[in-house]
Regions:
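Structural alpha/beta surface segment adjacent to cysteine/selenocysteine redox centers
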Residues: 24, 29-109, 169
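Residue-level preference for short coil/turn positions at secondary-structure junctions
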Residues: 17-19, 50, 144
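C-terminal cap of thioredoxin/glutaredoxin-like
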Residues: 26, 33-46, 105-173
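N-terminal targeting signals for export/organelle localization
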Residues: 1-5, 170-173
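Short clusters of hydrophobic/aromatic residues that line enzyme substrate/ligand-binding pockets
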Residues: 13-14, 98, 155
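A short beta-strand-turn-helix
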Residues: 4-21
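Residue-level signal for pocket-adjacent positions within structured domains
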Residues: 2, 7-9, 116, 150
């Protein structure tokens, strides 16, 4: 399966936008597997440096993870203030409690204007961004989280750090 749509300016991107390796994760902030993948991706980003661009797309599995949608909306609301990645990290680092009160604490921790955050949280376009990510995942063949795409193609191998890093290094040569 291929990534639909391809990465664009609408995505949240870390790293060099012209990097030779593009890693896209469809993730759910409440998913324990995504929680385990989070430090692995951070480590891989450090090891590959400017050879890697990383994109995160929301894929909340609401039936299994009742707080996942609100957590995704919270990160998108933080993006309005230019703090998507800070909120992304804070939410994963506090994954055990994603209640509304906990999300407000995360927003405070990353220095958001809380009244603006709360206002943006309720905006339809923020909810639409989460829904758009989810729909793109469905079109791309995502059926669980985390799901990874490397240079536009679905990655189906193990995502333990050694295996994923070895694969990424093999394609960057």
């Amino acid at each position: 399966m291929s990534l639909k749509p391809p990465v664009s300016e609408k995505d949240h991107l870390q790293g060099d936008k012209n990097a030779p390796i593009e890693l896209v994760e469809y993730g759910d902030y409440q998913c324990p597997h995504c929680g385990r993948a989070y430090p692995i991706i951070k480590s891989i980003q450090k090891k590959l440096g400017n050879k890697l661009k990383f994109v995160f797309r929301n894929f909340p599995l609401a039936e299994s993870h009742p707080d996942a949608v609100n957590a995704a909306i919270a990160t998108e609301a933080a993006a309005v203030q230019g703090k998507f990645w800070e909120m992304h990290d804070a939410v994963f680092e506090h994954q055990r409690d994603l209640s509304d009160a906990a999300l407000i604490k995360c927003a405070q921790k990353v220095g958001l204007d809380i009244s603006k955050f709360e206002s943006d949280f309720d905006k339809q376009e923020i909810q639409d961004k989460v829904e758009s990510d989810l729909e793109s995942g469905v079109r791309s063949g995502v059926n669980g989280t985390p799901s990874f795409f490397i240079n536009g193609k679905k990655y189906n191998d193990s995502w333990d750090e050694d295996t994923l890093l070895e694969y990424l290094r093999s394609i960057s040569v």
